[in-house]
Amino acid sequence: QIQKQLLRLSHLEEALLVLSRLDSGTLILQREEVDVFTVLVLASDNLQELLTATGTSVDIPELGGMAITVDLDWTMEAVMNLMKNCMEHNPGGTIHCAYEQNPLYTEIRIWDEGAGFLKEDMPYLFERFYRGRNAHEGGIGIGLALAKEILKRQNGTIRATNKQGAGACFEIRLYSH
């Protein structure tokens, strides 16, 4: 139990340092051209232990080469935070991914088959330290805020919606210019 709490505090400290560096503009992003499919697969691979422990699968279709210019490691971090959120609210289910590109932006969607977001939580989901009413017990309310800041620094946006029927959906847009 103590080891678990120490790990949690260490993760909190690390996340706060990253947010601080993002706020101050001192986090250097090493942008390179990478394929969207690669980003999603690498993010999923980094979560494999957690996915296996919760019996959660990830569906990532290979839709042909779609390049984005991002910092691979930090973009993976943002995507992993979204996937973790889906996993925590739909253990044993499937996390779905889809993506498409047009001349203005690349859109990446990540969604689950859970209950979706509560209406009263929607305006606050990306605020630091906000924990929704159905928040995972061990969460600290940093993951979605961190994902938003990482994407914003790369000319991106993120929004959360509820899928028709059931499930929470994150929509990322990474603009070309």
Predicted segments with their positions:
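Short alpha-helical segment of the dimerization/phosphotransfer core of two-component systems
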Residues: 4-9
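Conserved catalytic submotifs in the C-terminal HATPase_c
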Residues: 30-35, 52, 57-67
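Hydrophobic helix/adjacent strand patch within the catalytic HATPase_c
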Residues: 36-40
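Short helix-loop "hinge" at the ATP-lid/N-box region of the Bergerat-fold HATPase_c
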Residues: 85-87
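Conserved glycine-rich
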Residues: 93, 156-157
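Short beta-strand/loop element within the Bergerat-fold HATPase_c
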Residues: 94-104
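Short conserved segment of the HATPase_c
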Residues: 117-130
